[in-house]
Amino acid sequence: MTKQNIFIDDIYWERVQLYVKGHFEGVKPTRNFLLRNLTETKLFNANHVNIQGSTFEARFNIAILEKGNFLSTGNYILINRQEDEYVCQINPKFLNDKKKQMTLEELRDYNSLETQSLQKSYLLKNYGKSFQRYNNKEIKSYVIVPAISQEINEFIFKVQYKSEINKISKLKHLSFILHKALRKISFNVRDKIYLSIFNISKTVYKNNKNHVLFTSDSRANMSGNFKFIYEEMLKQQLDKKLVIHSIFKPNIANRRSFIDKLKFPYFLGKSKYILVDDYHPMIYKLQFRENQEIVQVWHAVGAFKTVGFSRTGKKGGPFIDSIGHKNYSKAYVSSNNDILYYAEAFGIEEHKVIPTGVPRTDVLFDESYKTRIKQSLETKLPIIKNKKVILFAPTFRGSGHRTAHYPFFKINFARLASYCEEHQATVLFKMHPVSY
């Protein structure tokens, strides 16, 4: 099968006009070139496209591209839309030629970069454009730079507009400094109270052996792996021997109630067993007793993506000296094959990773449960009756809950729809909670 690609061979500027030259490989040449942001909420047509044979030249007037205004801040991919949609790629030969032209100093800077995407972006940095304006009151900066996105590993144009006050009044400056200082004082006071409650509780209950805490910063109730562990504990009547506590919060951005802010460090210090199922930043700075067990029952079923220290050097990943995850005494995973990957992700020794299987997958062996759930889904979604059902439940891209999104442009929906028609199938999308 012939490979289908659209390659970018050159980028150049004439005033506010951005020109992109390239060629088609195995793709029908068409003029329908567009810039689209990663969240697929903005789409802008090229002002002019010239095609000769298999080559193209697209022009974008960035000063008027967005409804008569300049292209707004964001990251944009270049696409060609026809029956299928193609994301334009930078030609590897173009990058190799740029690398050969580097000076020794540039080569040293290039080799010091941690990822291939950063290195490729370094080779592209001179193909951007910067517009600046200064006066006594304001500094304006508008920059467009071609790069390789660390989030989606695709060629993008990074657009950034900044407008800064050149001089601020002494009163405003003083207000800013005061506000910043008060926030720091407030944080330090709350942090000291949190640590004090934890340390007192840890000392008072140093010999405690019968308290268990379920806690999550991304779960509102006893669900997921927690639910199945808890139900098994009840089934074995362990609730008669153990005192079970739970502190939950729907997502990491939510604030705890005043009562939970006091109860949380108290239960952390008191409990012999502390079960978590996701990233939980409030526990990593604590010094637990040696006889306490911090047990990670990670929510994912297998090592399907990189997390934690497996993302060191990538955007949003921790640095090697981060304390995140490292105080787990045990982590339970789905199989022996996962031990290496979860030990790496959590920054813990491999013997602490135990392949028991994932609690919430037990239901896959419960025929009555499967029948009940299937009937429930068919009632809610009649479209799936008598169809092959495909569930797509991807992770997210972005550095956290504020920037979380999914790059839907990587899915060829036309081909997916064609497959569904041919095979009597329905695809269900279940997005990651962080990207809601």
Region spans (language model):
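Active-site and donor-binding regions of nucleotide-sugar-utilizing enzymes
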Residues: 23, 35, 43, 55, ...
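Structural alpha-beta junctions
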Residues: 83-86, 234-245, 349-351, 415-426
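Generic recognition of flexible, low-complexity loop/linker segments
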Residues: 7-9, 200-202, 264, 283-285, ...
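Acidic/glycine-enriched edge-of-secondary-structure segments
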Residues: 178-190, 214-217, 360-366, 398-403
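Basic, ligand-binding patches in group-transfer machinery
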Residues: 1-210
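Conserved catalytic-core segment of nucleotide-activated headgroup transferases in glycan assembly
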Residues: 221-232, 360-436
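A short, charged/proline- and glycine-enriched loop
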Residues: 203-213, 291, 385-388
